[in-house]
Amino acid sequence: MSSLNIKQGSDAHFPDYPLASPSNNEIDLLNLISVLWRAKKTVMAVVFAFACAGLLISFILPQKWTSAAVVTPPEPVQWQELEKSFTKLRVLDLDIKIDRTEAFNLFIKKFQSVSLLEEYLRSSPYVMDQLKEAKIDELDLHRAIVALSEKMKAVDDNASKKKDEPSLYTSWTLSFTAPTSEEAQTVLSGYIDYISTLVVKESLENVRNKLEIKTQFEKEKLAQDRIKTKNQLDANIQRLNYSLDIANAAGIKKPVYSNGQAVKDDPDFSISLGADGIERKLEIEKAVTDVAELNGELRNRQYLVEQLTKAHVNDVNFTPFKYQLSPSLPVKKDGPGKAIIVILSALIGGMVACGGVLLRYAMASRKQDAMMADHLV
């Protein structure tokens, strides 16, 4: 009986406990979809507006077209005319050599020079005409040229390879980005030709300097050798004068070997020729006007100097690189296309429209719940 009383007593207190209220954290997806469907016209209008804005932006955005060229070191067949022009100079014992790899490296070095690029842009009629049409002052012109120079790039195609991975050949990609495809190709091609001309001019100038230095060296050395030979001739003449005096004093008129006499000759002042022979030899020595007449080596040196003086280096047109891809005419602009911009703009517009509709619905629902709560109170 006691247990029955306890159960009845406990059941009597159940109404004192409030019932659990339903959870408000659940999301009714069907209701949200219904809300969006009712506002479909608003959503579509916003999406259309964003798509139109994206299309307009795609036309307003600056166009970027990139022209590219791929170059490698020159091949021997390209330099045949240059090598032929150096044949006569090499015969004259002139060490002349233009290394193809060094010429290519010099081309890349000058291509990456910012000062040379600015110099080219300032001297290029095409670029200056484009900038002058904008009617800008000197400071703005300098800024525009600096901005253009940043769009000229040279990339080593082997730089991305691993160190232990061998490369078959050296290759560089040269590129320039401009507002139009024609401008990109024209500027890149013109700059490559400009740098190539500088490399050719500098290489030939180095050869001319070597020729000038060699010629000057041989001239000065020949002059010194002539002085040495002249001094030796003067010493011989003076020695013959002393020998003549000694021969006259000794009474030796004829060569001693013609008389069958045995005379021990003086190594310093020879009298074996006799006074007559010494006198005749002295006349011959004094009659020499050009010391090179009796010196074959000196005459050969003089001939070399004459040939070096006549030699000259002709202007030979050669290319310090070989095109694997000539400056291309871009057919596709850089960056996203108009279709992608419009699609992304439409997606952003859809998200903004849906978010706005749902936010407005949430605020209206909260306001309605607050009014109902006030009404019940």
UniProtKB/Swiss-Prot annotation:
UniProt topological domain (Cytoplasmic) ranges: 1-41, 360-377
Record keywords, A-Z: Cell inner membrane, Cell membrane, Ion transport, Iron, Iron transport, Membrane, Transmembrane, Transmembrane helix, Transport
Any Pfam family hit: Wzz
Compartments, record wording: Cell inner membrane
Disulfide bonds: none
GO biological process, any: ferric-enterobactin import into cell
The keyword Translocase is assigned to this record: no
Highest taxon in the source lineage: Bacteria
Database matches in Gene3D superfamilies: FepE-like (3.30.1890.10)
Presence of the UniProt keyword Transmembrane helix in the record: yes
Induction: Repressed by H-NS, induced by LeuO. A monocistronic operon.
GO molecular function ontology, one term from the record: protein tyrosine kinase activity
Function, as annotated: Part of the ferric enterobactin transport system.
Protein name: Ferric enterobactin transport protein FepE
Organism: Escherichia coli (strain K12)
Gene behind the chain: fepE
